[in-house]
């Protein structure tokens, strides 16, 4: 079983007197930084000039170029996109990564796949909230928190776990639960979840269901409502209480169809495809493919994204959502 940590297991004093340099001010950067600041910790932002820097300033932070922030920081949390981290690290962080500093991540991709190789005389840790930045912030403001993972790759100072737990407490994660993992486990399971289930699996399943109904002559609007719009209702129930709560809330007809037809949709071929996807992640094949894709300016990424944006389900969804008051901006 995984080690689990809560409020009493972490102490913000382990970060007192230290400067936390958060590199990047996107969704996670903004959410984590504001929580840390409101927890009484000293946070600065390392970011290039632009709208995000202006936003960080308006949120009350001291902002610096990345190199200057890395120089000032005792703890350096890298929250720029995965594909940019290695270049930013080599050019603007590595020269200032002196002994006993702490290098921190919220995803293990670049450490696990060797794109960033820190010196041996620093701590290398991960604190990974299991939710987007706006949720990290919102739950904190509500007096709650999102769960998080911590991992220790290097413990040069002997205090790496204390720092990880203190940071997790600073962003509100110990109000929920903090689980200890490894960079390898977090990276491989996170990528698999995104590709096979949460993003790739769900979107492909929805499109397949939509296309099946439309090809059979049903109205695209009906297909959209049945396979996409109602998805949130089901997922919310599962999120709140697992499959049991969801099945308690649906009709007996729906439940019978669920337990007898679902395994025909996600059958042996799907399991085999999932195993292949997991192997591509474990072997580094996916990482290599994604790194090379970025080196040539993402032609496949751009083409496939454009194709999905032009799918009929997006056109129909846009029209229907425009009629629904819950999606109208005030």
From Swiss-Prot:
The protein's name: Ketol-acid reductoisomerase (NADP(+))
NCBIfam families reported in the protein's UniProt record: ilvC, PRK05479.1, PRK13403.1
A Pfam family that the UniProt record links to this protein: KARI_N
Associated pathway: Amino-acid biosynthesis; L-isoleucine biosynthesis; L-isoleucine from 2-oxobutanoate: step 2/4; Amino-acid biosynthesis; L-valine biosynthesis; L-valine from pyruvate: step 2/4
Superkingdom classification of source: Archaea
Summary of the function given for this chain in its UniProt record: Involved in the biosynthesis of branched-chain amino acids (BCAA). Catalyzes an alkyl-migration followed by a ketol-acid reduction of (S)-2-acetolactate (S2AL) to yield (R)-2,3-dihydroxy-isovalerate. In the isomerase reaction, S2AL is rearranged via a Mg-dependent methyl migration to produce 3-hydroxy-3-methyl-2-ketobutyrate (HMKB). In the reductase reaction, this 2-ketoacid undergoes a metal-dependent reduction by NADPH to yield (R)-2,3-dihydroxy-isovalerate.
Organism: Methanocorpusculum labreanum (strain ATCC 43576 / DSM 4855 / Z)
GO CC terms in record: cytosol
Catalytic activity as recorded in UniProt: (2R)-2,3-dihydroxy-3-methylbutanoate + NADP(+) = (2S)-2-acetolactate + NADPH + H(+); (2R,3R)-2,3-dihydroxy-3-methylpentanoate + NADP(+) = (S)-2-ethyl-2-hydroxy-3-oxobutanoate + NADPH + H(+)
Lineage, opening ranks: Archaea, Methanobacteriati, Methanobacteriota, Stenosarchaea group, Methanomicrobia
């Amino acid at each position: 079983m995984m080690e689990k940590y809560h409020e009493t297991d972490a102490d913000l004093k382990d970060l007192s007197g230290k400067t936390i340099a958060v590199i990047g001010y996107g969704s996670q950067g903004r959410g984590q930084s504001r929580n840390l600041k409101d927890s009484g910790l000293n946070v600065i932002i390392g970011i290039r000039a632009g709208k995000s820097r202006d936003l960080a300033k308006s949120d009350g932070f001291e902002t610096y170029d990345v190199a200057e922030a890395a120089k000032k920081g005792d703890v350096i949390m890298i929250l720029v996109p995965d594909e940019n981290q290695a270049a930013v690290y080599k050019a603007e962080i590595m020269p200032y990564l002196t002994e006993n500093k702490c290098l921190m991540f919220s995803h293990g991709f670049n450490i696990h796949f060797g794109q960033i190789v820190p010196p041996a005389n620093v701590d290398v840790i991960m604190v990974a909230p299991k939710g987007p930045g706006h949720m990290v912030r919102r739950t904190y403001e509500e007096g709650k928190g999102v769960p998080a993972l911590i991992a220790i790759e290097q413990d040069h100072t002997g205090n790496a776990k204390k720092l990880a737990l203190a940071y997790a407490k600073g962003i509100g994660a110990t109000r929920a639960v903090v689980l200890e993992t490894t960079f390898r486990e977090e990276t491989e399971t996170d990528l698999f979840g995104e590709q096979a289930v949460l993003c790739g699996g769900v979107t492909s399943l929805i499109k397949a269901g939509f296309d099946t109904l439309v090809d059979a002559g049903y109205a695209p609007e009906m297909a959209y409502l049945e396979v996409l719009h109602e998805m949130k209702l089901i997922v919310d129930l599962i999120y709140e209480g697992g499959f049991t709560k969801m099945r308690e809330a649906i009709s007996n007809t729906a439940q019978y169809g669920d337990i007898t037809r679902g395994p025909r949709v996600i059958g042996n071929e799907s399991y085999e495809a999932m195993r292949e996807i997991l192997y591509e992640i474990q072997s580094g094949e996916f990482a290599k493919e994604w790194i090379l894709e970025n080196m040539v300016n993402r032609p496949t990424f751009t083409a496939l994204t454009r194709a999905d944006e032009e799918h009929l389900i997006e056109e129909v969804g846009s029209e229907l959502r425009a009629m629904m008051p819950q999606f109208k901006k005030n």
